Every structure is written in structure tokens, then in C-alpha cells.
A protein has these predicted regions:
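Beta-strand-rich N-terminal accessory domains
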Residues: 22-88, 111, 299
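Beta-strand-rich recognition/accessory modules
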Residues: 25-41, 104-105, 116, 204-308
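Acidic (Asp/Glu-rich), glycine- and aromatic
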Residues: 129-130, 134-187
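Extended, loop-rich substrate-binding clefts of extracytoplasmic carbohydrate-active enzymes
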Residues: 81-131, 147, 151, 162
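Bacterial N-terminal signal peptides
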Residues: 9-17
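Bacterial N-terminal signal peptides that target proteins for export
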Residues: 1-10
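Residue-level recognition of well-ordered beta-strand positions that form the cores
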Residues: 58, 114-116, 126-128, 137-141, ...
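Low-complexity, serine/threonine/proline-enriched polar segments
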Residues: 170-223
Length: 308
């Protein structure tokens, strides 16, 4: 599920990584057996039914088969070379038994793999289970002689079960006045037949200019551009009972957005990458039993710790 940015700005970002085996990792297997857990009983595990990198976050007390929080890691890797207006995909995630399975490395709190991509780009992808969620880290190395003005490799957190929010009734962003439903400017969504509401992308600008057209339709998808900018690179979804919050944030981004059919959360950071250089991009997914206020404060306290 790819998103095209509105207006004149095209968001393309790639996340890459340097190679090298790390001594801290004590196991190397095609897929790690079992799961890694944190102090509150949350689990992080590889979804082995997919060859391409997919992780699941399992809430405390839930069965290991639970699929409420699934993260495509990453969804795609896309670059735009200097002097070009066209984006090029170096990688696109596919479900099932498709492509080559990465060689996962596992430590007590971390799952990671490395991959060489077309275009002489090397990626290290690392997921670290912390006490309040998972930090996703991409280290990207440009081994070519090309300069990439934009690199883009978003994770794709997809929420189902108790977090699924197809009409965006529990998915929030934050602006200068506080919390606001991402889709608050489209109350008609609550009455639309689903086949009219979907497929849809709902976007809110952070650093990018707000598009002049608030509703656009491209390639059979309706894009809603929120008229008011957000004041933080943050998006959160409440569970149906309001007891849990899943929130994504990063250090900086152009906009935040969701595809409600998948209830995905995007806060996709991007960077430029010169020949022979590295870039590090990070996103944090908070999974917390608490209030929106609590989770937002946690995100803002941790925001500057995310590399970009």
C-alpha cells in the first residue's frame, strides 16, 4: 500500500544499512525461533508465513498467534536520483512465500537483518523491543556513484482486531489546540457505504504545505488532505475499549497519514544520501495501556532520541 504525496512535493524516502556481523547477536537462523519479550510481557516475533520481513507485536497475555499489530519491515524502498523527477523502487514487500527470506540475527531485545538492494544500496534493518513499544531503525549505505536527493523506506504498521478503525473514529493526530480525529473534517464518512468510503488515504501535513485541493481522486483512490496542519509527527489509534493506544512517531516528516482499510499508521521520515555515505532513519511504535495524553507525552519526550 503506497502513498503518493499531494501537491508539488513528492515524498520518496529510502532507508539503508551498513553490513557487518555484530558480536552482540548470539543467534543466526533463517527465522528466529520463539519470540523476544520485554518486562511487561509484550512479545516481538517474526511472522514466518511471509518470506519477506514482517513482524508482529503481541500484547501481554495474548496468544502468540495474535495478529492485531503487524508491521511490514519495510513496505518498500524507493529512491529519487539527483536530476530526476521519477522515483525508482529498489524493493517492494509481497506477502506469502515470495522472494528470498532474510538471514535474521537475534539478541535479547533485537531482531535485525541486512540486505543488498539494486542500485548498490545496502540496508541494515533493526527492530528493538523496548519497555513501551518497538524502535525501528534503518541504516542505509550508498555504495554507488549516484546522489539520491530522497530516500524512503517506510515501515507499515497494520492494525486489526481490537485496533481496526475502518472509519477513522479512533485515530488521532495532534495540533496546536490538542488532539483531533484525523478524519474530523469528513463527518460524512460515518454514513457512507463502505464501498464509497474505501479505498481512501487520509493525510495531514506537518512540515509540508497543505495542498490546495482537500479532496483528490487518483488511480481509483480518494485522497483527503486535512485543512489544518498537525504540530507533531505523531498518529495514534485507540483500541475499541479505549484501554490501549498504538502510536507512531518520528523525529521529522512531511506529513502523517493512514489507509483506514488497513488501519495503518505512517509518519515516514526521509533523507538525502550522497555516494559513499550513510543515513539513519528511525520510527518508534508505542504500544501502551494508558491515555492519549500519556502516550503523546511519551512520544514527545522520546522524539529527539530518534535519529534522522
Amino acid at each position: 500500500m503506497l502513498r503518493r504525496s499531494s501537491g508539488t512535493i513528492i515524498a520518496i524516502s529510502l532507508l539503508l544499512a551498513v553490513s557487518g556481523c555484530r558480536k552482540a547477536f548470539d543467534q543466526m537462523t533463517p527465522t528466529p525461533s520463539g519470540s523476544i519479550g520485554n518486562s511487561v510481557g509484550m512479545l516481538l516475533r517474526v511472522a514466518e508465513e511471509n518470506t519477506q520481513p514482517t513482524l508482529r507485536i503481541v500484547l501481554p497475555g495474548h496468544p502468540t498467534s495474535d495478529r492485531a499489530i503487524e508491521v511490514i519491515f519495510p513496505e518498500h524502498v524507493t529512491v529519487r536520483a539527483r536530476g530526476s523527477t521519477d522515483a525508482k523502487q529498489l524493493y517492494l514487500w509481497q506477502p506469502g512465500q515470495y522472494g528470498e527470506r532474510p538471514l535474521w540475527r537475534r539478541s535479547e531485545r533485537t531482531l535485525e537483518y541486512e540486505r543488498n538492494l539494486p542500485g548498490a544500496v545496502h540496508m541494515l534493518a533493526r527492530a528493538t523491543l523496548e519497555g513501551d513499544g518497538v524502535r525501528f531503525h534503518f541504516r542505509l549505505r550508498n555504495q554507488s556513484d549516484k546522489t539520491y536527493d530522497l530516500i524512503y523506506a517506510p515501515i507499515d504498521p497494520r492494525l486489526t482486531s481490537v485496533f481496526h478503525d475502518v472509519r477513522l473514529e479512533r485515530t488521532y493526530v495532534h495540533n496546536a489546540n490538542g488532539f483531533d480525529l484525523l478524519a474530523s473534517e469528513t463527518p460524512s464518512r460515518l454514513r457512507m457505504p463502505l464501498n464509497e468510503w474505501l479505498p481512501v488515504r487520509y493525510l495531514a501535513s506537518f512540515t509540508w504545505p497543505i495542498p490546495s485541493r482537500h479532496v483528490e481522486r487518483r488511480d481509483g483512490i480518494t485522497y483527503y488532505n486535512k485543512a489544518r496542519a498537525v504540530d507533531a509527527p505523531f498518529i495514534a489509534t485507540l483500541s475499541q475499549d479505549g484501554r490501549w493506544v498504538v502510536a507512531s512517531f518520528t523525529h521529522n516528516t512531511g506529513n502523517v497519514w493512514s489507509n483506514p482499510e488497513l488501519t495503518c499508521q505512517h509518519v515516514d521520515p526521509q533523507a538525502a544520501l550522497s555516494p559513499g555515505e550513510e543515513a539513519i532513519l528511525e520510527t518508534k511504535l508505542l504500544v501502551v495501556r494508558g491515555s492519549l495524553d500519556d502516550v503523546f507525552k511519551m512520544a514527545m519526550q522520546q522524539r529527539d532520541s530518534l535519529k534522522q
